[in-house]
Amino acid sequence: MRTPETPTPLWTYGLSIPHDPRAVSVVRATIRSILAAARLNCIVDTVELLVSEVVTNAYRHSSLETYVSMERTPDDFRVTVWDHAPGATPKPQTPADGDERGRGLGIVEACSDAWGVRDYPYGKAVWFSVAPKGVKD
């Protein structure tokens, strides 16, 4: 698991989402709009895929609302998803052929520039970052 550095964000957005199966599509649409407005279209597909995986995991493993933060730093775009699911720190798995679940964090690990998990007494935060190559704010 790679570790983050914490540069000061240029801007931040936050989204509180209910425990609702439609939340994943709401978060994807929100991130798509934010990245388009910031002229970061070069990372939309990757970020949309990764946020779908992380928010889906939060929905499946928690029964309460989830909070999503989106930050643009000088070097990357970071997404953090907080949920209220207690338990073991999630790790990438190697699912068996034909398994429909268990690939999400492996996809996050493969497609992000950095990612990680922070445990809290009330749940956890899964974060990832993607660097837009050749784009300056």
Residue spans for each PLM region:
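Conserved beta-strand-loop-beta-strand hairpin that lines the nucleotide-binding pocket
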Residues: M1-G14, Y59-D137
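STAS-typified acidic loop motif
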Residues: G14-R28
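Hydrophobic packing within well-folded, soluble alpha/beta domains
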Residues: V27, I31, V54, V79-V81, ...
